[in-house]
Amino acid sequence: MRAYERLLNYVKVYTTSDPVSDTHPTTARQFDLARMLVKELQDLGLADAHVDEHCYVYATLPATPGHEAAKGLGFIAHMDTSPDAPGENVKPQIHENYDGGDVVLPGTGAVLSTRQFPFLAKLKGQTLITTDGTTLLGADDKAGVAEIMTMLEILQKENRPHGKICVGFTPDEEVGQGADLFDVEHFGAAYAYTVDGDEAGEISYENFNAAAAFVTVHGFSVHPGSAKNAMKNAQNIAIEFHNALPYYDRPE
């Protein structure tokens, strides 16, 4: 099966995560795709494929003879889609032999403009897959899942030599919890790639890393008639705190 054929199957499975949920996974529906992938992995010969109670899928493709000593190489992608737009009843649109111009999404009339997305011009002549505009497509990151699954199929069909291949599919990446309960030791890879990126052929060898904090600032209210050198404005204190943060360490 081609990678795009798998993608078309996967995007029809509703897997939107929930940023306000306190469960792991944040939505039980993510198990629907997880179980589908476990079955497909087992059919591809990865006999140990399984999904744990928190919706993490793990599987291993053993090394081919003569390559058992190679360090395990991992490939990771996430199954959930962003809650910022609808993720149910996805209707993929296939644009064959794309002409390099603006793309109109038929469900809403929204336009994917080459002015806003200049990289589209590089894709002239290729086949594009988009949403109809009423939902997300879900290629983030079901395209990554499809690519990993297709790689596993090709490695075996073409008898390509390889070391141990470790596969991990995670829930809840879109709400910042994808790695929270990922079992690195159980995964078993010495090195790993996350297949979730930008243009074809691009590799990011480092990533932005940050933590979040909730800061509460308490002011001190004094009658304006006697406030000089006594009143404390919480907003101004918060501004001072914000400006004290290292400028070049901020995401922007």
For each of these PLM feature ranges, what is it?
Residues 19, 48, 161-164, 246-252:
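Flexible, glycine/charged-enriched surface loops at secondary-structure junctions
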Residues 67-164, 169:
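Active-site metal-coordination/substrate-binding segment of hydrolases
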